[in-house]
């Protein structure tokens, strides 16, 4: 790691962020291993899931004889809110890229018993799927060819994440701002 890239002490960071965040707000942080594992475990209670940013420009060429080139970065999502559909404290999540589609779907409920285990039942339930194109965990955004800062993120990636976790007019805090991409 670079000298300027120091780890913010986790306990103090989470204490301050938990005072600032709305009950259903998201805290979205970038990191690579082994840092991302330490970050995740520092607040496993509020950890929700990861995205993977697939970069178009790799890193680690000086060590290519010893390890694979690195073409991704982890994006960790934390929240005081829940990730359940009908929970009143549901974390803000506005999936991007959805397409309207009213389509009748059917699923089989599951039966379970101690002898056979879980298996599909004969009971089928119909529902209407209203959208399609839900995001996958891998986000593909081109790396910047000319960077102001060594860890600079593409504006399009930051815009995607902001639109996913906030509503129009809400405030975003970038407390790890390097080159200021979030403010653009």
Mark where each language-model region is.
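Core catalytic lobe of class I
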Residues: 1-184
């Amino acid at each position: 790691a670079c000298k300027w890239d120091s780890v913010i002490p986790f306990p103090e960071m989470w204490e301050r962020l938990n005072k600032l965040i709305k009950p259903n707000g998201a805290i979205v942080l970038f990191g690579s291993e082994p840092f991302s594992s330490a970050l995740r475990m520092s607040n496993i209670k509020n950890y929700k899931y990861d995205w993977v940013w697939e970069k178009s420009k790799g890193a680690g060429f000086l060590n290519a004889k010893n390890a694979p080139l690195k073409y991704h970065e982890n994006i960790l999502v934390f929240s005081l809110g829940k990730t359940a559909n009908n929970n009143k404290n549901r974390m803000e999540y506005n999936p991007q890229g959805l397409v309207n589609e009213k389509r009748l779907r059917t699923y089989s409920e599951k039966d379970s018993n101690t002898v056979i285990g879980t298996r599909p039942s004969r009971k089928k339930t119909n529902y209407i799927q209203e959208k399609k194109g839900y995001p996958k965990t891998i986000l593909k955004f081109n790396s910047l060819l000319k960077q102001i800062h060594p860890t600079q993120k593409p504006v399009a990636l930051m815009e995607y994440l902001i639109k996913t976790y906030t509503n129009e007019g809400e405030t975003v805090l970038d407390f790890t701002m390097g080159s200021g991409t979030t403010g653009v």
